[in-house]
Each structure stands twice: as C-alpha cells, then as structure tokens.
C-alpha cells in the first residue's frame, strides 16, 4: 500500500480505542503516505493516548456532530492544522451512536429520544460533515462512510440497522451535492468487527441473549463468507476504505463497496 495516498490530506473521525475501525483506517492511511487530521468526541485525553499509538503523529481536534459551533468552525480548525492554502483530499465518516436504545434493548422498547438522537449521529452527520468540509476539499477528493449491510434484520443490532439504512440514503444525496465540487462519496459495508461498539451491544441490557446472538452472527458470517471472515482483523476493511480515498476509483460515487469477504452474497 506504500505510496497509494502519498501527499493526500485526510480527515478521519471516530477513533475511540485502538480496536476502532477508524484507528485502523488511520494506521493504513499513514502507512500509505497520507497526512492526517483526526477528530474526537469527549474523553480527548484518553483518545490522544490512543492516537499516539499510530505510526506518525497527527493532530486531534474536538468534534461533536450535534454541536453547531463545532461544525461551523470545523473547516477553519482543520485549515489551522493543514496550513492556509492547503485543502483536504479525503474525509472518513466513522461515527455511530452509542445511545442505549439503539442496539442493546428489544426493538419495540427503544425510547424515541434514543432513536432520534442515534439516527442523527449515525446518519445525518454524514451530510453535516460533508457540508462543513466541502469548501476545503480538493477536486478529485473522496468522502467515505462506514456502513453495515442493513438489508436484513440483524439480531441484536435493532435500530442501528435502521440508522445504517438512513446512512445509505444520505450517502446518495451527499454524492449528488458533492459531485459539482469534483468530490466522490461512498460507503464501505464491513462485516462484523469486534470494536467497542460491538462490545457494548454484547454487554447491554439483553445480556446473555445478545451475547449469544452476536456469537451466532459471527459464526454464521464466517461460514457464509466464501473466503472466510475474521472479526478480530479490521485491516482488510481499512484497506478498502483507503482504496476509495485514493485516485484509483475516480468513477465511483454514491454507492456501497462491500468489505465482508462475500458473506452478503450468500444465503447459507
């Protein structure tokens, strides 16, 4: 992957721990030559310690996608990090809700407030991020969001599946709005990865039931995938994201690239 992203300036959102998909995207992007700006929400000191584990140093700025001031000043703050006159070549949206009702409660029991907030954070924020950053993106740039195939009702995933369906629709509109700027917008639909978010689902109020559902999901995914699946290895997903951030898919926008080793194409 060396050189694939040489000279590109990329903003990556969503690093929480070193198990985060966003962390591995950042790692692979740096190894491919990218200069990064990272964003974090809450617990910035903790996130900074995680960021310090990356191969290269990268600035970390605060971003709460529910905070209008954060969004309104984002382009200015990013420019402060990459230098006046420089622009971004890529943006990674790897933000999802941690609201209790989204995934770790029975579907019908989810509070409206959790669902509303969760869909805003997980889906609407893709449009908010694009709106904030398009003015400082170079033509030929790429916006990539993280997806999880929502075409079926996933056990224990509940309203997060609905949020991902919303994200897929938002992505199509972002692609349309970004097109005149010469910027592409796509999603990567990953198979299940053992991140902090997944651990939260397993450890939620469904308890043993959710843990068993996730275990069955993991086993079923590996069995369906023609080339197998490893929930502990996010690197193949990160490489797919970096391919979309590169110049090698200039005619691809408004769509979804699957990084699930083919599991979504198989019935059994």
UniProtKB/Swiss-Prot annotation:
Keywords: Fatty acid biosynthesis, Fatty acid metabolism, Lipid biosynthesis, Lipid metabolism, NAD, Oxidoreductase. NAD(+) binds at residues 20-21, 64-65, 95-96, 164, 193. One of its GO terms (molecular function) is trans-2-enoyl-CoA reductase (NADH) activity. Substrate binds at residue 157. It catalyses: a 2,3-saturated acyl-[ACP] + NAD(+) = a (2E)-enoyl-[ACP] + NADH + H(+); a 2,3-saturated acyl-CoA + NAD(+) = a (2E)-enoyl-CoA + NADH + H(+). The record marks 157 as: Transition state stabilizer. Pathway: Lipid metabolism; mycolic acid biosynthesis. Its EC number is 1.3.1.9. It comes from the Bacteria. This is Enoyl-[acyl-carrier-protein] reductase [NADH]. It comes from Mycobacterium avium.
